[in-house]
Structure formats: structure tokens, C-alpha cells
């Protein structure tokens, strides 16, 4: 005999065999398994009590609670003429178990049976409408609520607020809320309207209503706190988020899973990943949402290695990743720049259920491109059968990063022939490709083509065009474009103009661009470095000195040049002048060998760039101590002859290192791929893919 039978039998079968309805109602309430409910139902059939509306309603409620909606419907269908209570129970059961369409269908059947709804019917109906985001049906139900006089019922009103929030009708949700008299606004009402604004991208409105709620001395529950935390997360307001965290602790709600997820996400998005990790570690069995919040938090805050480690830990703990987990891990791989790591991630996706996911395919294309392998990106692209605009754009951007404009334009033409309409990212990739290839006419054509597709250029598009025109020497035209921008030019736009002014030694316009940058972002060291570069290019050494003094007065320090080289899947970091590596002496000897071979090959360094340019990579007294050169030396002594070297830099490639790396690639017969802050450079046989245009 089963455990359920053992539990039920003594209660079901007594000496008399007959009990009152209240006895069986109590028995239904105390059931701990759906098998017990079926035994109770069998006993009711024997006793002829299967038509008791009271007991059948109880059975429907209990079966729904156990998730057995099929049995609940079977019990309901046995009633010849069910009254309102069983109807409400089955509608509630369907709604509670997310069978929203069935809930609405049952309501339709109820109307056909000429059974009038009551105030308990509508909250479950409205939940079904919300679950389906069915605004039209929701409005129909709202009209019935009003016609039948249930519009003052607070539970019905709360359901209406939730419905309109789900359907993004915030005005209607607010109208319903405002229609509730102040004394009747429960915590559920306040939470519903706060959540409505928070979930629909209106954090300021959500916080304003939350403030009103606190002034009314309404104590928030964990649901309200989750919504408020989400609002502060949108605003990246760490101070207020911490205040809510303190309230959570004070109220003893810190173990509530949804609150932990919201707190974790808030800290991660505000850059406090260490605090987020502490909260994560408090969970005994973190669910998928928490893992995703942690992995994406690491990835979005530049902790790429930690994100990848978390992803592997998640898999090792048998937590099955979803698209969010995988795309976050792919993004982290793209940041690290390790091609071996990228290949490993690609192989993992190939073994998973997400190998045909278009969103993940586009992320893989981006990853391979950012890890220096356009061929890998193209392989993923060619294997993706269902190519939407995101996939096409990812490949075009990949070509753009590597300055392969002809391929980018050819792909765009194929995309048009395939009937896929471009988006803003498509044009950004095309502009990037034209910019890195010096194709001014084509780039200008694509920029103007955006209007034909009703796409408004964003700051990044303008920055690309300014850089394109400026590098080609069309500084006046570039400035005219800036003056005609419909929005205020940002840092990237003015930075592109200042860089172009440095290249062409246009001091007056460059100074103006620098002043705009200082007013927008006064503490950014890079702006001062750019201005100093301009003065150095124009040989205005007194002004170079003035910039250095200003930086010192503001307490600004230059970014330290750093390069990473991938050796056997591991990235080794080297900073300018760093002597801490355990193989330092070997590296130094290799650097000296490189320098001697460069001299034999006729390489002459640009001394002015080294001594007067404030860029760290160009400001070192000893030219051969540039971090890129050290990374190349380490790569040469650590990999077999002929192995390509992959270098990542945190600064733009300097003139000296660029010229030297071209010659080194020929001297050692290696391909050297360098990713700087601007683009990719593929050095081979003494030539760079950028054509010395960067």
C-alpha cells in the first residue's frame, strides 16, 4: 500500500463510513499529496457526495495547488450545474497554473451557462489577461467590472493596475490607482503601481510613488522593495540602493531569493561586484537568475576572467546555462581577447542546445572578431542559417574592426539582396570599415544613406564620420558636420576632431575641441594627453609643459602602457618598464636581439615622438621598453617558430612601435596581430593590414 493510502485510509473508512461535509472539507485541507485527494474523491463518489458544490470547490482548489489542473477540471466537469464557487475555483486554478487561455475560456463558458460573476471572479480573470498581455480582453473585463459594480473592490482594482502595467498602459494603471480612496490603498495597491513604473522603464516615477507610500506610513513588503531596487539599478544610484539594502536587513528579509537577486544585480550594475559576490555566496543553492546576474555583472564591469571562471563553476555545479549565461560568457571571452578561450567557448556552444540560436551566433561572431580571427567570425556567420539583421550586422562590424572595408561593403550588398533591412549597428560597422580604410567617399555615402532607412545617427556614427573626414584632412567639413548635429556632441565626437587636428597640426581648432572635452569630462586624462600630442606635433614645447603642469595640479596621472600576449591559451601582461616577470632576463636578451636586428634592418626611431608626446607608449626614455615590444619578445621565446603572435594593448599603437612591428614580422617570419584601442593590426612580411592608416 502506498504512503498516501496509508495516510488516508484510517480517516476515510470509519465504523459508520459516513461523515459530514465539514469532516471531508477538513480532510481535503489537510491533504499533503494529490494521491490523497483522488482517494478522498473516490470516497465521495461512493457516498454520493460528488455533487456537493462545497466539497468539489475544495477539491478543485486543492488539486490546483498541487499543480494537477487536469484532475481539477475532471472534478469540475462532474458537476451537472455548477454555481459560482466552483466556477471561480477552476478559473483561479487555471490562472494560478499559468493556463491563461483556459481561464478565459472557462469564463466564456460560465457566461454561456448564465452564471453571474462576483468580485472573486475578476482578480483571476485579470491575472489571465495580464499573463497573455491581452489588452483588448482586459478592457472588456474592466468594462464588465464597472457595469456590475465591482469597480470599488480593492482586489479587482489591484488586478487592473497589474494588467495595465503588463500591457504598458501606465496612464490607465495610474488612473485606476488614483481612483482608490486613500484608506483603501493597501500595500498590494502601492506595490502594483510602483512595480508598474519600475518594470516599464520609468524609475523616477516609481521612486516618487514609493516616496508617497512611505509618507503615508505604509510599510513596504519584499515585492515593493524589489521594484524600488530595480528602479535604483536603472538609475545606477548606489547610495539609495544601499539605503534599501539596510531596510531589507532591518526587516529581516535578506534571505528572500528575489530580493537577493535584485540586490546582487543592483551592486553588480553599480560596479560593486565584490559586494555582489558576498551576497551571492550567502545563497546555499543559487538559482539560474543569480548565476546570470553574477556572470553578467562581472562581464559588464570589466572582470572578464572572473565572469568566465563563474561560468565554468556554474557548469561544474550542474546548473544548466541559458542564453543570458552563455552570451555573458561569450562577451567576457571577447574582452579577454584569447583566441584559444574563444575556440573553447565555440566548441561548448556547438555541444549545447543553443548551437542554432541566432542571438548566440551573433555574439560568437563578435567574439571571434574581437579575438583577432575574422576567419572564425565568418565561419560562424556561414554556418548560421537563419540570419537576421543582428547576425549580418555583427559580421559587418567584425570586418570594420579589422579595416576590411571591401568585405564589409560586399556583405552589406548581399544583405540588401536578401531583403534584410539594415539597422544602426549595420551602418556603424560600415562607417568603421570605411574609416579604417580611408574610404572617405564611400563612408560619406553610407552616412547619408542612413536617412533613407529612417535611422537617426547616434554619437558613435558622428564620431566615425568626423574621424573619417578629419584623418583625410577635411577638418573644416568635419567641424561643419559637428555644428549641424541635432544633439549635443559628446566626448567621442570632440575626441575624434581633436585627434584629427593633432594629425594635421591644426592647433586652433584642436584647442577648441579640447576645451569642449574639458567642459564635458574634466577629469579624463586622455583629453589632456591628446592636447599635449597636438602641441608636440606642432613643436609648441612651452604649451606641452603647460599641459603637464595642469595635469599635475589636477592630480591626473597618465595611463600606464600595458600589453598582453597569448601563449598556450594564457594571457601574460607586460607594463612599460616592468621587470617583475620571472623570465625577465630572457625577455631582456630577446628585446636586445630585436633592437639589434631592427638597426641592421634600417629602422630609425622617431625621437621627437618619444621624448615629447605625453602618450605613455611614446613617452618612455628608452624606446625598446615599450610594452608591446616586451610582449612580442616574450611571445618569440615562448612559442614555436612560425606561430602567430596575438597582442592586446590598452593604448593606441604608437608610431615607433607600429613601424618596428612591421619590420619585426619580416625579420622573424611571423604574423603578429595587435589589437589596440582603435582597431586591429595584422602585421605580416613587413606590411600592416591598416596600410599605415590608423
UniProtKB/Swiss-Prot annotation:
UniProt-listed InterPro entries: DYW_dom (IPR032867), E_motif (IPR046848), Pentatricopeptide_rpt (IPR002885), PPR_At4g14850-like_plant (IPR046960), TPR-like_helical_dom_sf (IPR011990)
Pfam family, one: DYW_deaminase
Cellular component per GO, a single term: mitochondrion
Region (Type E(+) motif): 569-599
Stretches forming PPR repeats: 52-82, 83-117, 118-152, 153-183, 186-220, 221-255, 256-286, 287-321, 322-356, 357-387, 388-422, 423-457, 458-488
GN (gene name): PCMP-H43
Keywords of the record: Repeat
Membership in a protein family: Belongs to the PPR family. PCMP-H subfamily.
Region annotation Type E motif: where it falls in the sequence: 493-568
Organism: Arabidopsis thaliana (Mouse-ear cress)
Protein name: Pentatricopeptide repeat-containing protein At3g12770
PANTHER family linked: PENTATRICOPEPTIDE REPEAT-CONTAINING PROTEIN
Gene Ontology BP terms: mitochondrial mRNA modification
Region entry Type DYW motif, spans: 600-694
Single GO term (MF): RNA binding
Amino acid at each position: 500500500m502506498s504512503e498516501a493510502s496509508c495516510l488516508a485510509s484510517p480517516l476515510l473508512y470509519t465504523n459508520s463510513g459516513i461523515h459530514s461535509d465539514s469532516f471531508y472539507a477538513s480532510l481535503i485541507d489537510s491533504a499533503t499529496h494529490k494521491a490523497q485527494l483522488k482517494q478522498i474523491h473516490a470516497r465521495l463518489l461512493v457516498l454520493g457526495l460528488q455533487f456537493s458544490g462545497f466539497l468539489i470547490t475544495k477539491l478543485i482548489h486543492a488539486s490546483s495547488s498541487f499543480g494537477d489542473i487536469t484532475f481539477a477540471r475532471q472534478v469540475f466537469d462532474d458537476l451537472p450545474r455548477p454555481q459560482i464557487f466552483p466556477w471561480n475555483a477552476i478559473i483561479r486554478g487555471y490562472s494560478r497554473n499559468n493556463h491563461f487561455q483556459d481561464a478565459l475560456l472557462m469564463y466564456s463558458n460560465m457566461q454561456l451557462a448564465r452564471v453571474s460573476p462576483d468580485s472573486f471572479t475578476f482578480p483571476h480573470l485579470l491575472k489571465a489577461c495580464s499573463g497573455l498581455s491581452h489588452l483588448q480582453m482586459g478592457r472588456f473585463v474592466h468594462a464588465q467590472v464597472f457595469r456590475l459594480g465591482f469597480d470599488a473592490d480593492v482586489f479587482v482594482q489591484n488586478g487592473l493596475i497589474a494588467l495595465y502595467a503588463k500591457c504598458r498602459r501606465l496612464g490607465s494603471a495610474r488612473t485606476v490607482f488614483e481612483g482608490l480612496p486613500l484608506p483603501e490603498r493597501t500595500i498590494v495597491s502601492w506595490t502594483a503601481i510602483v512595480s508598474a513604473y519600475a518594470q516599464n522603464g520609468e524609475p523616477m516615477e516609481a521612486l516618487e510613488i514609493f516616496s508617497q507610500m512611505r509618507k503615508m506610513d505604509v510599510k513596504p513588503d519584499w515585492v515593493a522593495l524589489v521594484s524600488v531596487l530595480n528602479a535604483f539599478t536603472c538609475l545606477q544610484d548606489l547610495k539609495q540602493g544601499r539605503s534599501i539594502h539596510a531596510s531589507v536587513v532591518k526587516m529581516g528579509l535578506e534571505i528572500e531569493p528575489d530580493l537577493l537577486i535584485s540586490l546582487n544585480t543592483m551592486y553588480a550594475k553599480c560596479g560593486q561586484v565584490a559586494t555582489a559576490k558576498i551576497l551571492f555566496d550567502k545563497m546555499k543553492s543559487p538559482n539560474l537568475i543569480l548565476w546570470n546576474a553574477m556572470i553578467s555583472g562581472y562581464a559588464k564591469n570589466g572582470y572578464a576572467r572572473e565572469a568566465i571562471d563563474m561560468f565554468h563553476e556554474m557548469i561544474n555545479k550542474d546548473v544548466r546555462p541559458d542564453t543570458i549565461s552563455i552570451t555573458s560568457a561569450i562577451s567576457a571571452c571577447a574582452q579577454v581577447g584569447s583566441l584559444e578561450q574563444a575556440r573553447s567557448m565555440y566548441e561548448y556552444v556547438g555541444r549545447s542546445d543553443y548551437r542554432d540560436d541566432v542571438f548566440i551566433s551573433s555574439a560568437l561572431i563578435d567574439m571571434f572578431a574581437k579575438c583577432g580571427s575574422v576567419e572564425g567570425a565568418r565561419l560562424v556567420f556561414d554556418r548560421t542559417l537563419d540570419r537576421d539583421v543582428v547576425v549580418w550586422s555583427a559580421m559587418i562590424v567584425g570586418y570594420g574592426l579589422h579595416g576590411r572595408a571591401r568585405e564589409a561593403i560586399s556583405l552589406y550588398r548581399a544583405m540588401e539582396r536578401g531583403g534584410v533591412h539594415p539597422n544602426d549597428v549595420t551602418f556603424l560597422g560600415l562607417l568603421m570599415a570605411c574609416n579604417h580604410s580611408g574610404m572617405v567617399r564611400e563612408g560619406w555615402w553610407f552616412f547619408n544613406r542612413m536617412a533613407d532607412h529612417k535611422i537617426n545617427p547616434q554619437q558613435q556614427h558622428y564620431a566615425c564620420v568626423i574621424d573619417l573626414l578629419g584623418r583625410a584632412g577635411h577638418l573644416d567639413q568635419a567641424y561643419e558636420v559637428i555644428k549641424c548635429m541635432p544633439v549635443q556632441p559628446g566626448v567621442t565626437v570632440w575626441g575624434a576632431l581633436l585627434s584629427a587636428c593633432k594629425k594635421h597640426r591644426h592647433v586652433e581648432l584642436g584647442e577648441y575641441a579640447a576645451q569642449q572635452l574639458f567642459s564635458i569630462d574634466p577629469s579624463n586624462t586622455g583629453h589632456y594627453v591628446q592636447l599635449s600630442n597636438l602641441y608636440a606635433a606642432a613643436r609648441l614645447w612651452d604649451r606641452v609643459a603647460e599641459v603637464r603642469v595642469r595635469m599635475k595640479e589636477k592630480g591626473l596621472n597618465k595611463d600606464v602602457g600595458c600589453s598582453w600576449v597569448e601563449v598556450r591559451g594564457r594571457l601574460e601582461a607586460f607594463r612599460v618598464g616592468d621587470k617583475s616577470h620571472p623570465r625577465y632576463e630572457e625577455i631582456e636578451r630577446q628585446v636586445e636581439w630585436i633592437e639589434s636586428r631592427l638597426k641592421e634592418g634600417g629602422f630609425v626611431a622617431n625621437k621627437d615622438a618619444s621624448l615629447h608626446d605625453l602618450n605613455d607608449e611614446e613617452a618612455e626614455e628608452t624606446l625598446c621598453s615599450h610594452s608591446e615590444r616586451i610582449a612580442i619578445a616574450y611571445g618569440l621565446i615562448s612559442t614555436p617558430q612560425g606561430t602567430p603572435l596575438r597582442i592586446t594593448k590598452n593604448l593606441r599603437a604608437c608610431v615607433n612601435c607600429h613601424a618596428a612591428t612591421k619590420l619585426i614580422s619580416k625579420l622573424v617570419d611571423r604574423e603578429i596581430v595587435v589589437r589596440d584601442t582603435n582597431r586591429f593590426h595584422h602585421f605580416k612580411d613587413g606590411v600592416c593590414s591598416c596600410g599605415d592608416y590608423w
